[in-house]
Protein backbone atom coordinates (compact mmCIF):
# COMPACT_ATOMS: atom_id res chain seq x y z
CA UNK A 1 0.00 0.00 0.00
CA UNK A 2 2.99 2.27 0.57
CA UNK A 3 3.62 2.35 -3.16
CA UNK A 4 0.23 3.79 -4.09
CA UNK A 5 1.79 7.20 -4.67
CA UNK A 6 3.30 5.67 -7.81
CA UNK A 7 -0.25 5.58 -9.22
CA UNK A 8 -0.55 9.38 -9.09
CA UNK A 9 -0.74 9.77 -12.87
CA UNK A 10 -3.42 7.09 -13.27
CA UNK A 11 -5.49 8.39 -10.34
CA UNK A 12 -5.41 11.95 -11.67
CA UNK A 13 -6.38 10.76 -15.15
CA UNK A 14 -9.34 8.77 -13.81
CA UNK A 15 -10.45 11.73 -11.68
CA UNK A 16 -10.25 14.07 -14.67
CA UNK A 17 -12.31 11.71 -16.83
CA UNK A 18 -15.05 11.36 -14.22
CA UNK A 19 -14.96 15.10 -13.52
CA UNK A 20 -15.50 15.90 -17.18
CA UNK A 21 -18.51 13.58 -17.25
CA UNK A 22 -19.98 15.43 -14.28
CA UNK A 23 -19.29 18.82 -15.87
CA UNK A 24 -21.08 17.69 -19.01
CA UNK A 25 -24.21 17.15 -16.92
CA UNK A 26 -23.95 20.25 -14.75
CA UNK A 27 -22.67 23.00 -17.06
CA UNK A 28 -25.27 24.83 -19.20
CA UNK A 29 -25.06 24.13 -22.92
CA UNK A 30 -24.03 27.71 -23.71
CA UNK A 31 -20.95 27.42 -21.45
CA UNK A 32 -19.75 23.97 -22.47
CA UNK A 33 -16.81 25.29 -24.47
CA UNK A 34 -15.18 25.65 -21.06
CA UNK A 35 -15.20 21.87 -20.65
CA UNK A 36 -12.71 21.63 -23.52
CA UNK A 37 -10.40 24.07 -21.75
CA UNK A 38 -10.70 22.14 -18.48
CA UNK A 39 -9.81 18.92 -20.33
CA UNK A 40 -6.76 20.48 -21.97
CA UNK A 41 -5.56 22.13 -18.75
CA UNK A 42 -6.13 18.93 -16.79
CA UNK A 43 -4.14 16.87 -19.29
CA UNK A 44 -1.35 19.46 -19.16
CA UNK A 45 -1.21 19.18 -15.37
CA UNK A 46 -1.12 15.37 -15.51
CA UNK A 47 1.61 15.58 -18.15
CA UNK A 48 3.69 17.68 -15.75
CA UNK A 49 3.13 15.09 -13.00
CA UNK A 50 4.14 12.25 -15.34
CA UNK A 51 7.29 14.08 -16.38
CA UNK A 52 8.17 14.57 -12.72
CA UNK A 53 7.86 10.80 -12.18
CA UNK A 54 9.87 9.79 -15.26
CA UNK A 55 12.58 8.10 -13.14
CA UNK A 56 10.19 6.44 -10.66
CA UNK A 57 10.30 2.65 -10.34
CA UNK A 58 8.30 0.12 -8.38
CA UNK A 59 5.61 -2.55 -8.48
CA UNK A 60 2.12 -1.76 -7.21
CA UNK A 61 -0.51 -4.33 -6.18
CA UNK A 62 1.73 -7.20 -7.21
CA UNK A 63 1.62 -6.76 -10.96
CA UNK A 64 1.40 -3.12 -12.01
CA UNK A 65 4.85 -1.94 -13.02
CA UNK A 66 5.94 1.69 -12.73
CA UNK A 67 9.20 2.21 -14.59
CA UNK A 68 10.79 4.72 -17.00
CA UNK A 69 9.67 2.60 -19.97
CA UNK A 70 5.99 2.82 -19.04
CA UNK A 71 6.20 6.47 -17.99
CA UNK A 72 7.72 7.39 -21.35
CA UNK A 73 4.64 6.01 -23.08
CA UNK A 74 2.31 7.74 -20.60
CA UNK A 75 3.92 11.05 -21.53
CA UNK A 76 3.36 10.14 -25.18
CA UNK A 77 -0.33 9.37 -24.58
CA UNK A 78 -0.87 12.62 -22.70
CA UNK A 79 0.81 14.68 -25.42
CA UNK A 80 -1.37 13.00 -28.06
CA UNK A 81 -4.51 13.56 -25.94
CA UNK A 82 -3.67 17.25 -25.49
CA UNK A 83 -3.17 17.74 -29.23
CA UNK A 84 -6.44 15.91 -29.90
CA UNK A 85 -8.32 18.06 -27.39
CA UNK A 86 -6.84 21.23 -28.89
CA UNK A 87 -7.94 20.33 -32.42
CA UNK A 88 -11.40 19.25 -31.25
CA UNK A 89 -12.68 22.63 -30.01
CA UNK A 90 -14.31 23.84 -33.22
CA UNK A 91 -14.98 20.36 -34.58
CA UNK A 92 -17.04 19.26 -31.57
CA UNK A 93 -19.08 22.49 -31.60
CA UNK A 94 -19.69 22.34 -35.34
CA UNK A 95 -20.84 18.72 -35.19
CA UNK A 96 -23.08 19.42 -32.18
CA UNK A 97 -21.44 16.69 -30.11
CA UNK A 98 -21.78 16.39 -26.33
CA UNK A 99 -18.59 17.98 -25.05
CA UNK A 100 -18.61 16.45 -21.58
CA UNK A 101 -18.92 12.91 -22.89
CA UNK A 102 -16.49 13.48 -25.76
CA UNK A 103 -13.61 14.79 -23.64
CA UNK A 104 -14.32 12.31 -20.83
CA UNK A 105 -14.04 9.41 -23.29
CA UNK A 106 -10.84 10.92 -24.65
CA UNK A 107 -9.34 10.99 -21.16
CA UNK A 108 -10.61 7.51 -20.23
CA UNK A 109 -9.11 6.10 -23.42
CA UNK A 110 -5.83 7.64 -22.28
CA UNK A 111 -6.24 5.90 -18.91
CA UNK A 112 -6.75 2.55 -20.64
CA UNK A 113 -3.55 3.07 -22.61
CA UNK A 114 -1.65 3.91 -19.43
CA UNK A 115 -2.81 0.67 -17.82
CA UNK A 116 -1.83 -1.24 -20.95
CA UNK A 117 1.67 0.26 -20.99
CA UNK A 118 2.39 -0.47 -17.31
CA UNK A 119 0.80 -3.88 -16.89
CA UNK A 120 3.20 -6.50 -15.64
CA UNK A 121 0.41 -9.03 -15.35
CA UNK A 122 -1.93 -10.50 -17.97
CA UNK A 123 -5.31 -9.72 -16.36
CA UNK A 124 -4.58 -6.02 -15.84
CA UNK A 125 -3.12 -5.89 -19.35
CA UNK A 126 -6.37 -7.25 -20.77
CA UNK A 127 -8.45 -4.81 -18.70
CA UNK A 128 -6.39 -1.89 -20.00
CA UNK A 129 -6.80 -3.14 -23.55
CA UNK A 130 -10.57 -3.40 -23.16
CA UNK A 131 -10.93 0.04 -21.55
CA UNK A 132 -9.03 1.53 -24.48
CA UNK A 133 -10.99 -0.45 -27.07
CA UNK A 134 -14.47 0.25 -25.65
CA UNK A 135 -13.87 4.00 -25.39
CA UNK A 136 -12.56 4.11 -28.95
CA UNK A 137 -15.61 2.16 -30.16
CA UNK A 138 -17.84 4.89 -28.73
CA UNK A 139 -15.65 7.72 -30.02
CA UNK A 140 -15.56 6.23 -33.53
CA UNK A 141 -19.37 6.32 -33.67
CA UNK A 142 -19.68 9.63 -31.82
CA UNK A 143 -20.76 11.66 -34.84
CA UNK A 144 -24.50 11.11 -34.40
CA UNK A 145 -26.56 10.99 -37.56
CA UNK A 146 -23.56 10.28 -39.78
CA UNK A 147 -23.79 6.92 -41.56
CA UNK A 148 -20.03 6.58 -42.01
CA UNK A 149 -19.41 7.24 -38.33
CA UNK A 150 -22.01 4.63 -37.36
CA UNK A 151 -20.41 2.16 -39.77
CA UNK A 152 -17.00 2.91 -38.28
CA UNK A 153 -18.28 2.23 -34.77
CA UNK A 154 -19.99 -1.04 -35.74
CA UNK A 155 -16.93 -2.33 -37.60
CA UNK A 156 -14.65 -1.46 -34.74
CA UNK A 157 -16.97 -3.15 -32.23
CA UNK A 158 -17.36 -6.37 -34.22
CA UNK A 159 -13.76 -6.78 -35.33
CA UNK A 160 -12.47 -5.50 -31.99
CA UNK A 161 -14.56 -8.10 -30.16
CA UNK A 162 -13.20 -10.85 -32.39
CA UNK A 163 -9.59 -9.75 -31.87
CA UNK A 164 -10.14 -9.46 -28.11
CA UNK A 165 -11.52 -13.01 -28.02
CA UNK A 166 -8.49 -14.31 -29.92
CA UNK A 167 -6.15 -12.35 -27.66
CA UNK A 168 -7.87 -13.58 -24.48
CA UNK A 169 -7.72 -17.19 -25.68
CA UNK A 170 -4.00 -16.74 -26.29
CA UNK A 171 -3.56 -15.36 -22.77
CA UNK A 172 -5.43 -18.36 -21.33
CA UNK A 173 -3.15 -20.79 -23.19
CA UNK A 174 -0.05 -19.00 -21.93
CA UNK A 175 -1.45 -19.02 -18.38
CA UNK A 176 -2.28 -22.72 -18.64
CA UNK A 177 1.23 -23.49 -19.85
CA UNK A 178 3.05 -21.42 -17.22
CA UNK A 179 0.72 -21.48 -14.21
CA UNK A 180 0.97 -17.72 -13.60
CA UNK A 181 -0.31 -14.45 -15.00
CA UNK A 182 2.72 -12.36 -13.94
CA UNK A 183 4.77 -11.57 -17.03
CA UNK A 184 8.23 -11.99 -15.46
CA UNK A 185 7.19 -15.28 -13.82
CA UNK A 186 5.92 -16.55 -17.18
CA UNK A 187 9.39 -15.89 -18.60
CA UNK A 188 10.96 -17.90 -15.76
CA UNK A 189 8.49 -20.76 -16.27
CA UNK A 190 9.18 -20.90 -20.02
CA UNK A 191 12.94 -20.91 -19.38
CA UNK A 192 12.53 -23.83 -16.95
CA UNK A 193 9.90 -25.97 -18.70
CA UNK A 194 10.53 -25.15 -22.34
CA UNK A 195 7.97 -24.56 -25.06
CA UNK A 196 4.83 -26.68 -25.24
CA UNK A 197 2.46 -26.80 -28.26
CA UNK A 198 -0.17 -24.92 -26.22
CA UNK A 199 2.34 -22.19 -25.39
CA UNK A 200 3.33 -21.78 -29.03
CA UNK A 201 -0.33 -21.61 -30.07
CA UNK A 202 -1.01 -19.06 -27.33
CA UNK A 203 1.92 -16.99 -28.57
CA UNK A 204 0.45 -16.94 -32.08
CA UNK A 205 -2.98 -15.88 -30.78
CA UNK A 206 -1.50 -13.11 -28.62
CA UNK A 207 0.47 -11.85 -31.60
CA UNK A 208 -2.71 -11.85 -33.70
CA UNK A 209 -4.50 -9.77 -31.05
CA UNK A 210 -1.69 -7.24 -30.93
CA UNK A 211 -1.46 -7.18 -34.74
CA UNK A 212 -5.09 -6.05 -34.89
CA UNK A 213 -4.40 -3.17 -32.51
CA UNK A 214 -1.30 -1.98 -34.40
CA UNK A 215 -3.03 -2.46 -37.81
CA UNK A 216 -0.46 -4.96 -39.08
CA UNK A 217 -1.31 -6.81 -42.30
CA UNK A 218 -3.37 -9.03 -42.62
CA UNK A 219 -5.22 -7.74 -39.52
CA UNK A 220 -5.59 -4.22 -40.90
CA UNK A 221 -8.83 -4.36 -42.89
CA UNK A 222 -10.85 -2.46 -40.30
CA UNK A 223 -8.63 0.62 -40.17
CA UNK A 224 -9.32 2.46 -43.49
CA UNK A 225 -13.10 2.38 -43.01
CA UNK A 226 -12.93 3.21 -39.30
CA UNK A 227 -10.43 6.02 -39.86
CA UNK A 228 -12.57 7.49 -42.65
CA UNK A 229 -15.83 7.36 -40.70
CA UNK A 230 -14.67 8.40 -37.23
CA UNK A 231 -14.52 12.10 -36.27
CA UNK A 232 -11.24 13.44 -37.67
CA UNK A 233 -9.60 14.33 -34.31
CA UNK A 234 -10.52 10.86 -33.01
CA UNK A 235 -8.97 9.29 -36.10
CA UNK A 236 -5.70 11.06 -35.40
CA UNK A 237 -5.71 9.96 -31.75
CA UNK A 238 -6.67 6.39 -32.63
CA UNK A 239 -3.97 6.09 -35.28
CA UNK A 240 -1.22 7.31 -32.96
CA UNK A 241 -1.89 6.65 -29.29
CA UNK A 242 -3.62 3.26 -29.46
CA UNK A 243 -0.87 1.97 -31.73
CA UNK A 244 1.83 3.16 -29.32
CA UNK A 245 0.00 1.56 -26.38
CA UNK A 246 -0.21 -1.76 -28.18
CA UNK A 247 3.51 -1.62 -28.97
CA UNK A 248 4.33 -0.88 -25.32
CA UNK A 249 2.32 -3.92 -24.18
CA UNK A 250 3.74 -6.03 -27.00
CA UNK A 251 7.29 -5.28 -25.84
CA UNK A 252 6.39 -6.18 -22.24
CA UNK A 253 4.84 -9.52 -23.22
CA UNK A 254 7.26 -10.75 -25.87
CA UNK A 255 10.46 -9.40 -24.33
CA UNK A 256 9.44 -10.05 -20.71
CA UNK A 257 7.43 -13.29 -20.86
CA UNK A 258 8.56 -14.98 -24.07
CA UNK A 259 12.23 -14.10 -24.73
CA UNK A 260 13.18 -17.78 -24.85
CA UNK A 261 10.78 -18.23 -27.77
CA UNK A 262 12.48 -15.46 -29.74
CA UNK A 263 13.64 -17.80 -32.51
CA UNK A 264 10.00 -18.83 -33.01
CA UNK A 265 8.14 -15.52 -32.87
CA UNK A 266 10.74 -13.38 -34.64
CA UNK A 267 9.90 -15.13 -37.90
CA UNK A 268 6.25 -14.18 -37.46
CA UNK A 269 7.21 -10.56 -36.79
CA UNK A 270 9.40 -10.46 -39.91
CA UNK A 271 6.50 -11.71 -42.04
CA UNK A 272 4.13 -9.16 -40.48
CA UNK A 273 6.62 -6.32 -40.94
CA UNK A 274 7.24 -7.10 -44.62
CA UNK A 275 3.55 -7.46 -45.48
CA UNK A 276 2.62 -4.35 -43.52
CA UNK A 277 5.29 -2.08 -44.99
CA UNK A 278 4.72 -3.20 -48.58
CA UNK A 279 0.92 -3.32 -48.64
CA UNK A 280 0.47 -0.15 -46.58
CA UNK A 281 2.60 1.91 -48.94
CA UNK A 282 1.35 0.42 -52.21
CA UNK A 283 -2.36 0.63 -51.39
CA UNK A 284 -1.96 4.25 -50.24
CA UNK A 285 -0.99 5.34 -53.77
CA UNK A 286 -4.47 5.34 -55.40
CA UNK A 287 -6.33 6.84 -52.41
CA UNK A 288 -8.28 10.04 -53.07
CA UNK A 289 -9.52 10.64 -49.50
CA UNK A 290 -6.97 12.17 -47.12
CA UNK A 291 -8.14 10.08 -44.14
CA UNK A 292 -7.93 6.83 -46.10
CA UNK A 293 -4.49 7.82 -47.40
CA UNK A 294 -3.34 8.50 -43.84
CA UNK A 295 -4.91 5.20 -42.74
CA UNK A 296 -2.79 3.20 -45.17
CA UNK A 297 0.20 5.39 -44.32
CA UNK A 298 -0.43 4.51 -40.67
CA UNK A 299 -0.43 0.82 -41.57
CA UNK A 300 2.98 1.25 -43.21
CA UNK A 301 4.29 3.13 -40.16
CA UNK A 302 3.28 0.16 -37.99
CA UNK A 303 5.46 -2.00 -40.23
CA UNK A 304 8.46 0.24 -39.60
CA UNK A 305 7.87 0.05 -35.85
CA UNK A 306 7.76 -3.75 -36.09
CA UNK A 307 11.34 -3.64 -37.36
CA UNK A 308 12.43 -2.49 -33.91
CA UNK A 309 10.72 -5.54 -32.39
CA UNK A 310 12.45 -7.83 -34.90
CA UNK A 311 15.86 -6.54 -33.77
CA UNK A 312 15.20 -7.84 -30.21
CA UNK A 313 17.67 -5.39 -28.69
CA UNK A 314 17.96 -2.29 -26.52
CA UNK A 315 18.60 -0.25 -29.66
CA UNK A 316 15.45 -1.67 -31.27
CA UNK A 317 13.21 -0.91 -28.28
CA UNK A 318 14.73 2.56 -27.93
CA UNK A 319 14.15 3.17 -31.64
CA UNK A 320 10.50 2.10 -31.30
CA UNK A 321 10.05 4.48 -28.37
CA UNK A 322 11.76 7.37 -30.14
CA UNK A 323 9.89 6.87 -33.42
CA UNK A 324 6.56 6.49 -31.62
CA UNK A 325 6.99 9.93 -30.04
CA UNK A 326 7.89 11.51 -33.39
CA UNK A 327 4.95 9.70 -34.95
CA UNK A 328 2.64 11.55 -32.54
CA UNK A 329 3.65 14.93 -33.94
CA UNK A 330 3.94 13.79 -37.57
CA UNK A 331 0.64 11.96 -37.81
CA UNK A 332 -1.27 14.24 -35.45
CA UNK A 333 0.07 17.21 -37.41
CA UNK A 334 -1.40 15.82 -40.62
CA UNK A 335 -4.73 15.13 -38.92
CA UNK A 336 -4.80 18.59 -37.34
CA UNK A 337 -4.39 20.08 -40.81
CA UNK A 338 -7.16 17.79 -42.10
CA UNK A 339 -9.39 18.85 -39.19
CA UNK A 340 -8.81 22.55 -39.89
CA UNK A 341 -9.69 22.03 -43.55
CA UNK A 342 -12.80 19.97 -42.74
CA UNK A 343 -14.01 22.60 -40.26
CA UNK A 344 -14.03 25.14 -43.10
CA UNK A 345 -14.91 23.18 -46.25
CA UNK A 346 -16.53 20.00 -44.91
CA UNK A 347 -14.46 17.77 -47.20
CA UNK A 348 -11.76 15.13 -46.81
CA UNK A 349 -11.13 14.68 -50.55
CA UNK A 350 -7.57 15.41 -51.65
CA UNK A 351 -8.75 17.15 -54.82
CA UNK A 352 -10.50 19.76 -52.68
CA UNK A 353 -7.13 20.68 -51.14
CA UNK A 354 -6.27 22.46 -54.40
CA UNK A 355 -4.71 25.85 -53.68
CA UNK A 356 -4.75 25.33 -49.91
CA UNK A 357 -1.36 27.04 -49.57
CA UNK A 358 -2.92 30.31 -50.73
CA UNK A 359 -5.88 30.03 -48.39
CA UNK A 360 -3.88 29.04 -45.29
CA UNK A 361 -0.07 28.85 -45.48
CA UNK A 362 0.09 27.46 -41.92
CA UNK A 363 -2.29 24.54 -42.56
CA UNK A 364 -0.58 23.67 -45.85
CA UNK A 365 2.90 23.89 -44.28
CA UNK A 366 1.88 21.67 -41.36
CA UNK A 367 0.42 19.07 -43.72
CA UNK A 368 3.48 19.15 -46.00
CA UNK A 369 6.14 18.89 -43.30
CA UNK A 370 4.17 16.30 -41.31
CA UNK A 371 4.00 14.10 -44.40
CA UNK A 372 7.70 14.63 -45.13
CA UNK A 373 8.49 13.60 -41.56
CA UNK A 374 6.41 10.44 -41.96
CA UNK A 375 8.35 9.72 -45.16
CA UNK A 376 11.64 10.12 -43.30
CA UNK A 377 12.99 13.06 -45.30
CA UNK A 378 15.76 15.08 -43.58
CA UNK A 379 15.90 17.42 -41.75
CA UNK A 380 12.50 16.37 -40.40
CA UNK A 381 12.34 14.39 -37.16
CA UNK A 382 11.04 11.26 -38.88
CA UNK A 383 14.39 10.80 -40.63
CA UNK A 384 16.18 10.30 -37.30
CA UNK A 385 13.53 7.83 -36.13
CA UNK A 386 13.77 5.69 -39.24
CA UNK A 387 17.57 5.87 -39.10
CA UNK A 388 17.56 4.25 -35.65
CA UNK A 389 14.99 1.64 -36.68
CA UNK A 390 17.01 0.64 -39.73
CA UNK A 391 20.25 0.62 -37.73
CA UNK A 392 18.68 -1.70 -35.16
CA UNK A 393 17.90 -4.37 -37.75
CA UNK A 394 21.18 -3.88 -39.63
CA UNK A 395 22.97 -4.59 -36.34
CA UNK A 396 21.15 -7.95 -36.35
CA UNK A 397 22.18 -8.65 -39.95
CA UNK A 398 18.71 -8.10 -41.41
CA UNK A 399 20.18 -5.89 -44.12
CA UNK A 400 17.55 -6.90 -46.68
CA UNK A 401 14.81 -5.69 -44.34
CA UNK A 402 16.49 -2.30 -44.05
CA UNK A 403 16.78 -2.06 -47.85
CA UNK A 404 13.09 -2.93 -48.21
CA UNK A 405 12.17 -0.28 -45.65
CA UNK A 406 14.21 2.38 -47.45
CA UNK A 407 12.69 1.50 -50.83
CA UNK A 408 9.16 1.63 -49.43
CA UNK A 409 9.93 4.98 -47.78
CA UNK A 410 10.80 6.27 -51.25
CA UNK A 411 7.43 4.99 -52.48
CA UNK A 412 5.68 6.87 -49.68
CA UNK A 413 7.28 10.12 -50.84
CA UNK A 414 5.32 9.77 -54.09
CA UNK A 415 1.84 9.63 -52.58
CA UNK A 416 2.66 12.24 -49.95
CA UNK A 417 3.78 14.62 -52.70
CA UNK A 418 0.45 14.11 -54.47
CA UNK A 419 -1.12 15.93 -51.54
CA UNK A 420 1.58 18.61 -51.68
CA UNK A 421 1.00 19.02 -55.41
CA UNK A 422 -2.69 19.72 -54.84
CA UNK A 423 -1.98 22.20 -52.04
CA UNK A 424 0.81 24.18 -53.70
CA UNK A 425 0.28 23.79 -57.45
CA UNK A 426 -3.51 23.53 -57.65
CA UNK A 427 -5.86 26.47 -58.02
CA UNK A 428 -8.36 27.18 -55.25
CA UNK A 429 -12.06 27.14 -56.22
CA UNK A 430 -13.53 30.44 -57.29
CA UNK A 431 -14.93 32.40 -54.40
CA UNK A 432 -13.07 30.34 -51.80
CA UNK A 433 -12.17 32.20 -48.63
CA UNK A 434 -9.10 32.00 -46.37
CA UNK A 435 -9.38 29.22 -43.81
CA UNK A 436 -10.49 30.22 -40.35
CA UNK A 437 -8.49 28.31 -37.76
CA UNK A 438 -9.30 28.52 -34.05
CA UNK A 439 -6.53 30.04 -31.88
CA UNK A 440 -6.14 26.86 -29.82
CA UNK A 441 -5.70 24.76 -32.94
CA UNK A 442 -3.25 27.27 -34.36
CA UNK A 443 -1.09 26.98 -31.24
CA UNK A 444 -1.14 23.18 -31.42
CA UNK A 445 -0.24 23.29 -35.12
CA UNK A 446 2.70 25.66 -34.58
CA UNK A 447 3.99 23.54 -31.68
CA UNK A 448 3.84 20.36 -33.77
CA UNK A 449 5.58 22.03 -36.69
CA UNK A 450 8.38 23.39 -34.49
CA UNK A 451 8.93 20.04 -32.76
CA UNK A 452 9.22 18.23 -36.10
CA UNK A 453 12.01 20.61 -37.08
CA UNK A 454 13.73 20.85 -33.69
CA UNK A 455 13.88 17.09 -33.13
CA UNK A 456 15.10 16.62 -36.68
CA UNK A 457 17.97 19.05 -36.19
CA UNK A 458 18.74 18.34 -32.51
CA UNK A 459 17.31 14.92 -31.54
CA UNK A 460 19.79 14.19 -28.73
CA UNK A 461 17.58 14.95 -25.67
CA UNK A 462 14.75 12.71 -26.84
CA UNK A 463 17.04 9.95 -28.15
CA UNK A 464 18.87 9.87 -24.81
CA UNK A 465 15.59 9.72 -22.91
CA UNK A 466 14.20 6.94 -25.12
CA UNK A 467 17.40 4.87 -25.09
CA UNK A 468 17.91 5.24 -21.32
CA UNK A 469 14.30 4.19 -20.71
CA UNK A 470 14.84 1.17 -22.96
CA UNK A 471 17.97 0.22 -21.00
CA UNK A 472 16.04 0.26 -17.70
CA UNK A 473 13.42 -2.04 -19.23
CA UNK A 474 16.05 -4.74 -19.80
CA UNK A 475 17.39 -4.51 -16.26
CA UNK A 476 16.32 -7.39 -13.97
Swiss-Prot record:
It comes from the Bacteria. Pfam families: Proton_antipo_M. The keyword NAD applies. NDH-1 is composed of 14 different subunits. Subunits NuoA, H, J, K, L, M, N constitute the membrane sector of the complex. It is an enzyme of class 7 (translocase). One of its GO terms (biological process) is ATP synthesis coupled electron transport. The keyword NAD applies. This is NADH-quinone oxidoreductase subunit N. PANTHER family: NADH DEHYDROGENASE (PTHR22773). Keywords: Cell membrane, Membrane, NAD, Quinone, Translocase, Transmembrane, Transmembrane helix, Transport. It is a multi-pass membrane protein. It catalyses: a quinone + NADH + 5 H(+)(in) = a quinol + NAD(+) + 4 H(+)(out). Belongs to the complex I subunit 2 family. NCBIfam families: NDH_I_N (TIGR01770). One of its GO terms (molecular function) is NADH:ubiquinone reductase (non-electrogenic) activity. InterPro entries: NADH-Q_OxRdtase_suN/2, ND/Mrp_TM. It is found in: Cell membrane. Its main location: membrane. GO terms for cellular component: plasma membrane. The chain crosses the membrane at residues 7-27, 33-53, 59-79, 100-120, 122-142, 156-176, 199-219, 237-257, 265-285, 305-325, 363-383, 399-419, 437-457. NDH-1 shuttles electrons from NADH, via FMN and iron-sulfur (Fe-S) centers, to quinones in the respiratory chain. The immediate electron acceptor for the enzyme in this species is believed to be a menaquinone. Couples the redox reaction to proton translocation (for every two electrons transferred, four hydrogen ions are translocated across the cytoplasmic membrane), and thus conserves the redox energy in a proton gradient. Its EC number is 7.1.1.-. The gene is nuoN.
Amino acid sequence: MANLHLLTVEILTAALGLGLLALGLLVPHSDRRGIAYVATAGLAGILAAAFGMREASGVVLGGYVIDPFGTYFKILFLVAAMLTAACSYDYVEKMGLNQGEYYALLVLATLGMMVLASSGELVSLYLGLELMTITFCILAAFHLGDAKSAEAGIKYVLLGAMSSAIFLYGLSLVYGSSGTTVIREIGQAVATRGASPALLLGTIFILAGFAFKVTAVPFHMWSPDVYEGAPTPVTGFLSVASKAAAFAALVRVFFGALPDLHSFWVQLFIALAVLTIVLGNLVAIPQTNIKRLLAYSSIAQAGYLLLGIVSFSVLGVGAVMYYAMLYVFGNMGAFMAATAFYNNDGSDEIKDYAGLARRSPLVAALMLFSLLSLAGIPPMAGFVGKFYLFMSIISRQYIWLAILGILMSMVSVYYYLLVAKAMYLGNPPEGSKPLRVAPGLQVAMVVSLLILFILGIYPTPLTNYAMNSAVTFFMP
